[in-house]
Structure formats: C-alpha cells, structure tokens
Amino acid sequence: MAKKNAKNSKNSSASIARNKRATFDYKFEEKLEAGLSLMGWEVKSIRMGKVNLSESYVFLREGEAYLFGCTIAPLNTASSHVVCDPLRSRKLLLKRKELDKLQGLVDRKGYSIVPISMYWQKGAWVKIEIGLGKGKKEHDKRDDTKDREWQIEKARTIKKAVQQ
C-alpha cells in the first residue's frame, strides 16, 4: 500500500484556525506575527485541527504576552500521563521591542490585542497572527456590512452584463 503524499493530506495546509469574529468586531491598525510556547500534546491536537480561537484574547503581564481563552482540545490517545488543561494561558514569543510597543499602546491609547489566525510556518512552527486595534461601534459594523453587500451586488451586476 502506498503512503499518502504529504501535499495531498488534509492537515498539510498552512492555515490552522481563524478568528472570524475578530475582523468584524475590531479595526486593526497593525498586525504582528508571534510564536507560541506549546506542550507536546497541544502540537498533536493542533495537527488534528482541534483548536478554537473564537473567544481568545492576548493580555500583557510582567512584560510578557499571553494568549488566553484559546481552546486546544486534547486527544484521547496523545496524553495519558499528562494532565491536559485545554484553556491554559500560553506564552507568546515576541521580541522585547515589540512587547514594549504593545504595552505602551494598550496602556495609553486603549488598544486591544486580539488573535486573528493560527498557521504553520515552514511546516514545523506554529505561529499566531495578532492584531492591534480598537473595537468597532455598532454603526461601524453596519457600514462594513453595507459595503460588503454592495461589493457583492456590484460583482453580480457586472457578471450579468458580461454574460449578455
């Protein structure tokens, strides 16, 4: 029996998880890439796609950044001798200059730090894209929805005109 080709495997895509709610609720001014400090069972679970970023956020404590609220469900077979906490806070690996910049903006200007997506880099490293931004008001969300619907309607109209 032949082995599966790694390129055709379902788990070989670079993207692991996306926080779709983040782009709807926040207007990002800057995006950063950060590494994650993970345990072995977490990496195995991430490879199987058992991760949820929807209610997670980043907080800064004692000069370090932590990812909180990210759920990584443990596999039944991967961790029999280790106590697995799916909601534990995970340390983000950022440079000191980036941490200082984030701390200053969060403290002084009221920015929020929210995870946007999690992905594989070079097939071995789990990276997380975090966004630095402010929360949108209700009218901003409505404006974005109107713009998106207008773009879809415009594309449909153009497509119909080209087909005729």
From Swiss-Prot:
Keyword annotations from UniProtKB, A to Z: Cytoplasm, RNA-binding
Transmembrane segments: none
PROSITE patterns, alphabetized: SSRP
The keyword Cytoplasm is assigned to this record: yes
Domain of life of the organism encoding this protein: Bacteria
Principal location: cytoplasm
An example Gene Ontology CC term for this record: cytosol
Subcellular location: Cytoplasm
The keyword Cell membrane is annotated on this UniProt entry: no
Gene Ontology molecular function: any one: RNA binding
GO biological process entries: trans-translation
One Pfam family recorded for the sequence: SmpB
HAMAP family, alphabetized: SmpB
Alphabetical list of PANTHER family matching this protein: SSRA-BINDING PROTEIN, TMRNA-BINDING COMPONENT OF TRANS-TRANSLATION TAGGING COMPLEX
Family the UniProt entry places it in: Belongs to the SmpB family.
Protein purpose: Required for rescue of stalled ribosomes mediated by trans-translation. Binds to transfer-messenger RNA (tmRNA), required for stable association of tmRNA with ribosomes. tmRNA and SmpB together mimic tRNA shape, replacing the anticodon stem-loop with SmpB. tmRNA is encoded by the ssrA gene; the 2 termini fold to resemble tRNA(Ala) and it encodes a 'tag peptide', a short internal open reading frame. During trans-translation Ala-aminoacylated tmRNA acts like a tRNA, entering the A-site of stalled ribosomes, displacing the stalled mRNA.
Designated name of the protein: SsrA-binding protein
Organism expressing this protein natively: Shewanella pealeana (strain ATCC 700345 / ANG-SQ1)
Upper lineage: Bacteria, Pseudomonadati, Pseudomonadota, Gammaproteobacteria, Alteromonadales
Originating gene: smpB
